[in-house]
């Protein structure tokens, strides 16, 4: 279904088609990883395991880097196709068919660029959600520490009232 391989132009467009397909596959796989990671972030088990949220944040970072690299590749391919389109020889007998294939590739690139923008937004959501869950865990920890601090408040208050002034402590004159 590709352009064929009987001439250099057709081989070039066939290679471009394959590169675009592989970039689309990378984006699809990255989207699946992001979906899985978000499911794990929002699962009840992740709130009990801080290491799971840290691992999720690392996976999100890795996918973000991959998406950025795919975006850069798409921009480079767009420049290549723009240059090729501007310099294409129209003397070939089937230049109309090649132009149609070229336009199709350019539309595919445009669609994938929009998809990478969407994926970048999803990465942003995933990072925000993960950091929010980490913040909730920290709130739970601070709540426990606040209760413990409140338990030690009365002895601390007594110690701060009397301080180290042993002559003013009435308990020293108590009989045993």
Q: How would you label these PLM feature ranges?
A:
Residues 107-176:
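Hydrophobic alpha-helical transmembrane segments and their immediately adjacent juxtamembrane loops
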Residues 1-132:
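Extended amphipathic alpha-helical scaffolding segments in membrane-proximal extra-membrane regions
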């Amino acid at each position: 279904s590709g352009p064929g391989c009987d001439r250099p132009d057709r081989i070039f467009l066939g290679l471009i088609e394959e590169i675009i397909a592989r970039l689309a596959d990378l984006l699809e796989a990255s989207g699946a990883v992001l979906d899985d990671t978000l499911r794990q972030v929002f699962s009840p088990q992740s709130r009990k395991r801080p290491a799971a949220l840290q691992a999720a944040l690392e996976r999100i970072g890795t996918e973000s880097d991959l998406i950025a690299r795919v975006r850069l590749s798409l921009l480079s391919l767009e420049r290549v196709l723009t240059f090729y389109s501007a310099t294409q020889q129209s003397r070939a007998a089937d230049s109309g068919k090649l132009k149609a294939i070229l336009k199709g590739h350019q539309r595919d690139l445009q669609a994938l660029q929009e998809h990478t923008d969407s994926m970048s937004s999803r990465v942003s959501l995933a990072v925000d959600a993960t950091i929010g869950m980490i913040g909730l865990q920290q709130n739970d920890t601070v709540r426990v520490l606040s209760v413990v601090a409140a338990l030690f408040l009365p002895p601390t208050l007594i110690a701060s009232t009397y301080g180290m002034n042993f002559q003013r402590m009435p308990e020293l004159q108590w009989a045993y």
